Amino acid sequence: MIENDINRRGLLIGGGVGLAAAGIAASMGAKQAAAQSSPDSLLRKVLDRGKVRVGTGSTNAPWHFEDTNGKLVGMDIAMAHILAKGLFDDPEAFEFVQQDPAARIPNINTGKVDIVVQFMTINSGRAQLVAFTRPYYVESISFLTRPDGKRKSFEKMLAGGSDTKVSILQNVDAEENIHKQLPKAQVLMLDTQANVIQALDSGRVDAAAVDLSTTRWLRKLRPDRYEDSGHRWFSMLYGAAVRQGDTDWLKFVDSVFDVAIYGHDNEIYDKAFFDFFGEKITGRKAGFPPI
């Protein structure tokens, strides 16, 4: 009985390996699978067209910006490569539609683009207008500091009390947001993100309150000039957006993103995460899915 069970398990293990290998070598391409989707689904239309139209921007590093050769790069752009690879086994099979952030939702709903990948925060208001994919990044607010600064860590900033100075982009909740983290800090509100960071560069403040992705990007570019205080708060989810009502298209994109973030086809995602945030992805384990 025990021997039979062991033999049976051996066959299952062997079969499992065989199936996994078969999945790598001979998985059904998306184009062949399109026959299973609804005739009205965008999935079928995109596959028939031969490329996916991606709405994004071009002026916001590290998300979407032009490199020294004029090529669009960034974490959002990497997600477009991932989607194109999932669709056509060709990470270059897409067309970028460059757009203003204000055009993100209109361009989805008018059909100008198939999907928007443009550092779009998921919230309940937007979710009434478009359908969001699974998140591909968790953003937050952080304190960008200097490695030679007197108060480069959050602990030292907190201990500095009213002597600690922080710059932040001007908005109605700016001062309150800082004081929730540093109750006694002096808050310098400025009109542009560039000026917020310039205040740190010039020594007018001890820290600049910016997106965590900005902190990671600048620290990756200039570790001699910028440091991460180690403190972050107010988490926000970034996801891609598609038109509502097309379950086949949404589920396909989700599946492609899941495999890129959590599964085996993670080369593009991992490289982009390191290139633009300076961090290596670790912790993927077999067994219980962390999704």
What are these regions, as identified by a protein language model?
Residues 39-116, 128:
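Extracytoplasmic small-molecule ligand-binding "clamshell" domains
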Residues 103, 119-129, 180, 197-235:
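A ligand-binding cleft/hinge motif common to bilobed small-molecule-binding domains
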Residues 1-7, 20:
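N-terminal secretory signal peptides
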Residues 94-106, 188-198, 236:
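Short helix-initiation/N-cap motifs at beta->coil->alpha
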Residues 29-30, 81, 85, 93-159, ...:
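Acidic, polar ligand-binding/catalytic clefts
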Residues 58, 137-148, 212-257, 276-291:
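Periplasmic-binding protein-like
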Residues 7-16:
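N-terminal export leaders
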Residues 36-37, 81-82, 86, 148-149, ...:
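Extended ligand-binding regions for polar small-molecule ligands
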